Each structure stands twice: as C-alpha cells, then as structure tokens.
C-alpha cells in the first residue's frame, strides 16, 4: 500500500526513497515481493512508482558490492501501522491506559499512517508529552503519552501480517491454475529461472560489479 521503508544507506545513495513501490528490475516486471530478491543480482536499473509517477533508478556498477560491504540484508522493508502490543511496567506510559490492539492514528492532531513516520515525528518531542489519537473498537480516544529523551514511547508494537493484510496494507496474490494451465505456468517459471540464473552468473563473474561479495544472499 505505502511502498517500502528504505533506510539502508546504499539504497538511499542510489536514489531510493521510503514509499517507493518496485515495479520492475531491468525489463522484468515485479508483482510479488519475493521477486525482488530473485532478480536483484544482475540488476542494472529498477523502475519504481513514486508519488504516482514512474521513475527509473540506474544502479551503480558495484551496487551489490556496496550492499555486501555494508552488511545489508533487509533492503526493502514492509511498512505497517503503529498497533500496540503491550506497555512494559518500566515505561513512563505504563499508566497511560493503552490496551493491546490500540491503533495509534497520530500525534498532536497530525495524522500518521506508518510506524516509520512515528519514529521521525517523535524526534520533535523529546522529553515532552504528546496527545495521541487512538482507534479502539471503532471508537477514537485521546491519550497523553510521554516521549523520553531518546524520542521513544517505550511501547511494544504489534507485528501481525494477517491483520495488516485485512486492514489493506498488504496485498496477497494467489494464482489458481487448471491442470493444463499449470504446465504453461511451470514452463514460464522454468524459463524465467534459467534466464535469471545466467544473469546472476554474468554479474558474479564480472569483477566490476563486486557481486561475488554477496554470494551469501540478500533478503528483500
């Protein structure tokens, strides 16, 4: 829904931004998240959707080498809302009246849809108290929350992919094939895998790409 959360310095230097949606790697259309890791080795350019427009990002020749040097693993990270899982007793917000499942919608009247945006917004309120707008059981309530000097609320967030999907943050793609169609789909998958395999070999054996440094693999 909201693209990917980008904080890896190599990706940022290459021109990626949080919110980008990956549309294609080279000439290969990307429809599923798992395909990014499949095609990123050998990638020369990536097409993203940003603010409703398509943008082509040309990758540096040693892109994979840079990622390996940085120890990059989680490159394109999912974005999700801020849902409360629990509040530890040691937190200054332990008595704020939060409950598991509370969806924090914003701070001080400002709507904030994604958790990564909360992280940056809280930096403006170090050591202060903020009013949080919270959705609980289809009702909106307000709670005062304390931000510590490290710009944190000390609240454990809930990570629930199923719930995020139900809320419309993620799309799950399921393809059903008939018996006959499965052969065609299998052949296309085989051909795509073979082409991608040789593309990866070409990148790995080209010293300029430094792809050999990332033989351990990357997680998109």
Where are these regions (language model features)?
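Interdomain regulatory linker/hinge segments that flank or connect interaction modules
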Residues: 1, 25-67, 197-199, 212
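Membrane interface segments of multi-pass transport proteins and intramembrane proteases
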Residues: 2-3, 179
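PDZ/PDZ-like domain micro-motif
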Residues: 5-21, 35-38, 88-102
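Alpha-helix boundary recognition
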Residues: 12, 37-41, 123, 206
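Exposed loop and linker-edge segments at protein-protein interfaces
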Residues: 15, 23-24, 29, 97, ...
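A short, compositionally biased
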Residues: 17, 39-44, 124-130
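Functional transmembrane alpha-helices
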Residues: 70-97, 103-105, 110-111, 116-220
């Amino acid at each position: 829904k909201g693209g990917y959360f980008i904080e890896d310095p190599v990706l940022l230097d290459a021109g990626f931004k949080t919110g980008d949606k990956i549309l294609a790697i080279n000439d290969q259309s990307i429809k599923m998240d798992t395909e990014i890791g499949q095609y990123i080795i050998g990638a020369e350019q990536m097409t993203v959707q940003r603010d409703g427009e398509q943008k082509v990002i040309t990758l540096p020749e040693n892109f994979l080498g840079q990622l390996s040097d940085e120890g990059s693993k989680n490159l394109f990270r999912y974005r999700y809302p801020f849902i409360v899982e629990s509040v530890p007793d040691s937190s200054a917000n332990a008595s704020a009246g939060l409950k598991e499942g509370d969806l924090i919608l914003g701070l001080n009247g400002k709507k904030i849809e994604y958790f990564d945006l909360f992280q940056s917004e809280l930096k403006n309120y170090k050591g202060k108290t903020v009013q949080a707008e919270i959705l609980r059981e289809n009702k909106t309530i307000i709670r005062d929350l304390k931000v510590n000097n490290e710009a944190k609320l000390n609240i454990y967030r809930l990570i629930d992919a199923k719930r995020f999907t139900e809320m419309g943050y993620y799309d799950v793609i399921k393809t059903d094939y008939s018996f006959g169609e499965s052969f065609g789909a299998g052949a296309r998958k085989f051909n795509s895998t073979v082409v991608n395999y040789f593309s990866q070999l070409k990148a790995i054996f080209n010293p300029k790409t430094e792809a050999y440094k990332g033989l351990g693999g990357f997680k998109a």
